[in-house]
Amino acid sequence: MIFGELRRLYLIIGVMLSYGLDELIPKTRLTLPLRLGRNLLFWMPNNHAQRMLGERLRLALQELGPVWIKFGQMLSTRRDLFPPAIADQLAMLQDRVQPFDGALARAHIERSMGQPLETWFDDFQQEPLASASIAQVHTARLKNGQEVVIKVIRPDILPMIKADMRLMYRLASWVPHLLPDGRRLRPVEVVLEYEKTLLDELNLLREAANAIQLRRNFDGSPMLYIPEVYPDYCSETMMVMERIYGVPVNDVAALEKQGTNMKLLAERGVQVFFTQVFRDSFFHGDMHPGNIFVSFEHPENPQYIGIDCGIVGSLNKEDKRYLAENFIAFFNRDYRKVAELHVDSGWVPPDTNVEDFEFAIRTVCEPIFEKPLAEISFGHVLLNLFNTARRFNMEVQPQLVLLQKTLLYIEGVGRQLYPQLDLWKTAKPFLEEWIKDQMGLPAILRALKEKAPYWAEKLPELPELVYDGFKQHRLLQKSVDRLTVEMRVHHVRQSQSRFLFGIGATLLLIGTFLMTQGADEGSLPAWLMAAGTVSWIIGWKRTA
């Protein structure tokens, strides 16, 4: 470690100990050096002993800064790593930090655009509209009068991220050596997944492309509106998009005051999620309340507004089909089908004992279904499923973890808006219709239509391909026949060699025995030994 890393590590240890996080260290023989080391750092007492452990962990991560805040937010979705009380506290982490100087933002914009800011924008507000750990947002107008927001990456964030990521990897590499269950948790993979997410958020060109894709997917939809992005003004560290006005989705009082149809709004949240996942295979992966607003227009026919598209997820056709069938099998309590789907999809190893897996799923999930369907959480069903599957060596599926996190957000918001929301009743027709569309006659006809141009292109080559196929088959058959003959000859030679080896060994033993007995047989022992040697040589040559 270089001096800077050691200093940062000392600071991190100091913050963690000041919140008493040494309580998270398990009391095992492997962790004895860590616990002894804690006792040596007597000048770093627990200053928050009156608080619960989960709250202390959340406060410590907030104090450590942006990289650790976002890491805690990601860990809140991995409920196989922590008890529910701690995971719930991590989910409360707020991605809000002190803004950086607006003059720095102005200088960054001018550097990115290559000209004075006034060349492109009017009414630039140096005071930020919002500030988060990765970037902050300023308002302005384009020269045509269009109100926009300008998102600017923090100027000092990249060196901080790189330094803290190096420390995270180092700490993660220690976990398997310190915890009995450390290898199963795959700590290095967790950090790797986090680093990828974080680096994606640092590239605003990626976020701009995501927003453009989502806007196109929901163009003209009454359910969701994505603000327009202006690509000509965007770079890796700066993004310009349309300014929107709406009610924060978690401001229930304001929504009710304007007469919003809360039942329809809650149901549309579910429909938006399943449309993104199953129709578009492209979903907003950070749909927490801070990124979702409700339009002021048409409260009786409410429309969501989505921003901050830095994190998105996608599922391939196989994952979508297995996921949809899993949901339906789950709510039909067909646990055998759920277990088989996991094996068929490759999410768990092919040698998994299906009966044991089915029993484990039944044990965990059957108590959930004692509740009325309207009270059952899709997200927690998925969470229990993944946690059970991990005990059967399910590989970490980043796209499914992100989907589960997003589903929990959607459920939480939906039930906050309309507590009687029946998620299953809203989602089941959508899932059943999607499966029927994917597996019925329309799906076959659609596949034929998609493949038709390719087949038409290859049709003139078909006679030649058939001829080449027959020719290759003939050549292969000749090779097989020749190989069969060679194997038979080799087998005969091996049999003869074994026979000659046996004769040679017998003659040598008899000749040696007669010679050691001193029998008066003249030159017979020598002749026997010579014959045995010749037999060995002939047998050896046949094997060569």
From Swiss-Prot:
Its EC number is 2.7.-.-. Residues 123-500 form the Protein kinase domain. The chain crosses the membrane at residues 1-21, 499-519, 520-540. It is a multi-pass membrane protein. Pathway: Cofactor biosynthesis; ubiquinone biosynthesis [regulation]. It is an enzyme of class 2 (transferase). One of its GO terms (molecular function) is ATP binding. Pfam families: ABC1. ATP binds at residues 129-137, 151. Keywords: ATP-binding, Cell inner membrane, Cell membrane, Kinase, Membrane, Nucleotide-binding, Transferase, Transmembrane, Transmembrane helix, Ubiquinone biosynthesis. The keyword Nucleotide-binding applies. The keyword Nucleotide-binding applies. The active site is at 286 (proton acceptor). One of its GO terms (biological process) is regulation of ubiquinone biosynthetic process. Is probably a protein kinase regulator of UbiI activity which is involved in aerobic coenzyme Q (ubiquinone) biosynthesis. Belongs to the ABC1 family. UbiB subfamily. This is Probable protein kinase UbiB. It comes from Sodalis glossinidius (strain morsitans). The gene is ubiB.
